[in-house]
């Protein structure tokens, strides 16, 4: 299909450095033309931070670009190739319904991938139609923006455009295209792909590109590829700890969904935990709980081991020595993760300094929450506000004992109680994207064309650490249900 190149002053300043890699890494592909694009959502704060032109983006020409009907003159649309371990099984993948337009360079020199998701078939579609449904695209928009507001590294959503098409899933659904913004779309699965089907020279090209893109200081190191591995391990240790601290369950931690940049990607079957339970699973296809909340750190370590395996030819010419180097690096993950998690949990309890018994204090609270079915977010919200009469734990012997120990712990630090409360307020969100509130917003938007519910939800989620009466509606738990909440891989 011939590309419809245009010059439209959207503010996009595109380069195409990924296209300079060997062609094994991508296939050039034009977006499919869609019949009737309409703008559903536009992310004005993100537009401002990227210094794009909102007025042009919401014009007919701008919407055509967001829909893939027109292509910016500097763009080189391409589908990226990658592989991945899905639920532990290795398979060939690739962008089956997404196209990278290029990399937007901000006036400050920052580089961001601009990707259209749901833009049509590619050579990696594996029999799929390359399309996306409106509901899952709006869901990714909501959750990714909530994650960003929570301070968790994430891909962002610039816009959602409806296509005017009906796509066939279990039923007919309205089609949509999401414009995703990311530090990059390089994945552990990208390295697995070239490790399996490429040459060592092509592997080195990807590693060098990744260093240049994300870890430039690595060039000066004695072993740049070891530095690359170590930095990715650090970033993932920080990321997974942040997930755990807010009760986020990704749901599909396949290696193709682990970014080298350390951003959260793919919001298909994700959800936030209500009642605290380490075995929490939302994904309808995760029947054995591989990606349960409590197992996410272990899965991250497993994924990183797969990444390390791909780098073995670059780490040392001696295979045995390369394995030792990789194993030593991977062994650091558990300690790095635990340090990040403990630091975050101390902050959630208003604790500034370290004591050896802190971990026991934290684990005891979590155990009590699990025993009595206490809501994860609201328990910390209640401890922060001081209204402990609002928690189901009040009056439980274990909690009353724990609460006394916690108060004693706070007295053993120099910082004031006011300082502790301020630390807790900045560490414990008052509002998260509760599953029932997200579904409420999606139903209004998709079925009724009413985006006001979603707009109000997004406004609340943009201020997660604001403790106000306006947030109360979004902090309420769902009504008891006989059916556990389930998510699906729609995105």
Swiss-Prot record:
Cofactors demanded by this protein: Mg(2+); Mn(2+)
GO MF annotation list: AMPylase activity; ATP binding; magnesium ion binding
Protein residues bound to ATP: 94, 96-97, 117, 129-130, 180, 187, 266
Reaction equation(s) it catalyzes: L-seryl-[protein] + ATP = 3-O-(5'-adenylyl)-L-seryl-[protein] + diphosphate; L-threonyl-[protein] + ATP = 3-O-(5'-adenylyl)-L-threonyl-[protein] + diphosphate; L-tyrosyl-[protein] + ATP = O-(5'-adenylyl)-L-tyrosyl-[protein] + diphosphate; L-histidyl-[protein] + UTP = N(tele)-(5'-uridylyl)-L-histidyl-[protein] + diphosphate
Catalytic residues (positions): 256 (proton acceptor)
Enzyme class label: transferase
Domain of life: Bacteria
The protein's Enzyme Commission number: 2.7.7.-, 2.7.7.108
InterPro entries the UniProt entry points to: SelO (IPR003846)
Keywords attached to this entry: ATP-binding, Magnesium, Manganese, Metal-binding, Nucleotide-binding, Nucleotidyltransferase, Transferase
Residue sites binding Mg(2+) per the record: 257, 266
The protein's role, per its UniProt record: Nucleotidyltransferase involved in the post-translational modification of proteins. It can catalyze the addition of adenosine monophosphate (AMP) or uridine monophosphate (UMP) to a protein, resulting in modifications known as AMPylation and UMPylation.
Family label: Belongs to the SELO family.
Stored NCBIfam families: PRK00029.1 (NF000658)
Name assigned to this protein: Protein nucleotidyltransferase YdiU
Primary gene name: ydiU
């Amino acid at each position: 299909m011939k590309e419809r190149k245009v010059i439209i002053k959207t503010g996009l300043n595109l380069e195409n450095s990924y296209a300079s890699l060997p062609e094994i890494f991508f296939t050039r592909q034009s977006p499919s033309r869609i019949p009737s694009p309409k703008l559903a959502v536009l992310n004005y704060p993100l537009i401002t931070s990227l210094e794009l032109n909102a007025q042009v983006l919401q014009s007919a020409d701008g919407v055509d670009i967001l829909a893939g009907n027109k292509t910016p003159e500097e763009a080189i649309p391409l589908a990226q190739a990658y592989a991945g371990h899905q639920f532990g099984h290795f398979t060939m993948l690739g962008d089956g319904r997404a196209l990278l337009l290029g990399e937007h360079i901000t006036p400050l020199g920052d580089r961001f991938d601009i990707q259209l998701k749901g833009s049509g078939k590619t050579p990696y579609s594996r029999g799929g139609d390359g399309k996306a449904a409106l509901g899952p695209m709006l869901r990714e928009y909501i959750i990714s923006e909530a994650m960003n507001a929570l301070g968790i590294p994430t891909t962002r959503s610039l816009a959602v455009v409806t296509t005017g098409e009906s796509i066939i899933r279990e039923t007919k659904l309205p089609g949509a295209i999401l414009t995703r913004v990311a530090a990059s779309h390089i994945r552990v699965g990208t390295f697995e792909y070239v490790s399996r089907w490429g040459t060592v020279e092509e592997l080195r090209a990807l590693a060098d590109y990744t260093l240049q893109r994300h870890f430039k200081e690595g060039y000066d190191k004695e072993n740049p590829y070891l530095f690359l591995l170590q930095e990715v391990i650090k970033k993932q240790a920080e990321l997974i700890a942040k997930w755990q601290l807010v009760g986020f369950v990704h749901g599909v931690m396949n290696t193709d969904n682990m970014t080298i940049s350390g951003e959260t990607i793919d919001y298909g079957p994700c959800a936030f935990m209500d009642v605290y339970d380490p075995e929490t699973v939302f994904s309808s296809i995760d029947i054995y709980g591989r990606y349960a909340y409590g197992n996410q750190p272990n899965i991250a370590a497993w994924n990183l081991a797969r990444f390390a395996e791909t780098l073995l030819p670059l780490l040392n010419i001696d295979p045995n020595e390369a394995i030792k180097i990789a194993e030593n690096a991977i062994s650091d993950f558990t300690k790095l993760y635990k340090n990040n998690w403990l630091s975050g949990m101390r902050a959630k309890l208003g604790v500034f300094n370290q004591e050896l018994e802190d971990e026991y204090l934290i684990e005891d609270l979590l155990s009590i929450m699990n025993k009595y079915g206490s809501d994860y977010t609201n328990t910390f919200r209640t401890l922060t506000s001081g209204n402990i009469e609002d928690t189901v734990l009040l009056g439980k012997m274990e909690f009353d004992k724990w609460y006394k120990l916690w108060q004693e712990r706070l007295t053993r630090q120099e910082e004031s109680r006011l300082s502790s409360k301020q630390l807790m307020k900045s560490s414990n969100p008052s509002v998260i994207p509760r599953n029932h509130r997200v579904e409420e917003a999606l139903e209004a938007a998709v079925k009724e064309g009413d985006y006001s519910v979603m707009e109000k939800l997004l406004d609340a989620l943009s201020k997660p650490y604001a403790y106000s009466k306006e947030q109360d509606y979004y902090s309420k738990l769902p009504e008891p249900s006989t059916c556990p909440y389930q998510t699906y891989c729609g995105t």
